[in-house]
Amino acid sequence: MKVLRPTQPTSEQLTVINNHKPGVFVVRGAAGSGKTTTALYRLKFTVRYWQRRHRDGFIDGPVRVLVLTYNKTLRGYIEELTKEQIKGNDVELTISTFAKWATDRVPYERILQEHEHNGKLDALAAALPLSEDFVRSEVDYVLGRFTPDRLTEYIECERQGRGRSPRMPASLRRRLLDEVIVPFQEWKKEQQAWDWSDLANAMAAKRADDPYHVVVVDEAQDFSANQVRAVLNHVTDEHTLTFVLDAAQRIYPQRFTWAEVGLSVGPHNSKLLSKNFRNTRQIAAFAAPLLRDVETTDDAAIPDLSSCGEDGDKPLLVQGTFTQQMDHVVQFLNDLGPENDESVAILHAKGGGWFSEVKARLNAAGLAWVPLTRTGEWPTGPVNVALSTMHSAKGLEFDHVIIVGLSSEVMPHATEPGDSERDAHLRLLAMSAGRARKTLTITYKPSEASDLIACMDPDTYDVKAV
């Protein structure tokens, strides 16, 4: 699978790359602005700075470097790129997801399976006037933002970034805390089991024996406050720590302020990357309206249409049964030709068994493909067609993106603006669309279409009925 290599840094990116001063630096930017490229170049030069410190005798042992990514797929992609940036026997490099990094470093109880976690929350919240999906998301938000001894702060806190609907007055928050969250915490202890929030808390409480001199956290908008606290607890007294993020692409319920995790972030140690180097003007114009009514924060960056340097076809919406949708996909891949070296991502909101027909049709057509979802290693062979969930495509980029089967069944939510699940799905769709460099195709069956179709600007796409 082709990795799209970093290009020469721009003058805008060089202001970040050439800032070697120890401390925290935050890189913000919209999809396609080169955030990860900038972070990797910055990593290269900051590691050189620390290598000089090592050679000059200011630090003992190797320069310890940690790169944390959002998921396994992105970890494999970043590792493939980072290998080219970091040289030298005096560097100890770790590239990992937060979960893998944490489970390698703390003794832990078994991690709850998703069905156990969700089943218990659903049972505890049955009497609340809230949907199951919202309760799960809100509980994850609370347990990710507040440490176990400060959970009551949730009752009066500002829930910025959590949407305007459903409303959560203090009385309902108190019920959620008393009837769901506290009993859930007690139940986990009885089961001698943890969830991912417990892992973050354990890492935040454990002082590392081998702290890191250099840390890069990519896609940091989907890290929880407690995960950030854990990272801060595992750096040397003098360190270089880089967070790379865009809150407009947040697809998990994490929202906190830098101040509440003990960091001061301002113009002196942050940079907004405004230019879009990835998308054509047409793809950026399609993605931008999806975020128009989505609640944003200071860390969000909306795609800048004026900065796109390339023109292309409008995104294409293909209407038909799933069989007809796949007819179009197979024809598109065949039209690229056997010698094609352009990368293609076929994305779905759910993955798993939902990809069964996609795989069967590609196999029947003799078209090779590779899976990307939860793959820890980036596939290095010649195959350039990848299957992935929309979530796992985060942080990646491809020449062509095809989002298949966009239905109300796989992306259910309330229809009113401000609904938290609707906002999350719009961010997910905009993020997925922003993975495409050249073409974007979305397929769906009109009678089962997701309500998100209505959020798209008709002037920004073409329609093909098959």
Feature map (PLM): residue ranges:
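N-terminal pre-P-loop "Q-motif" helix
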Residues: 4-23, 196-199
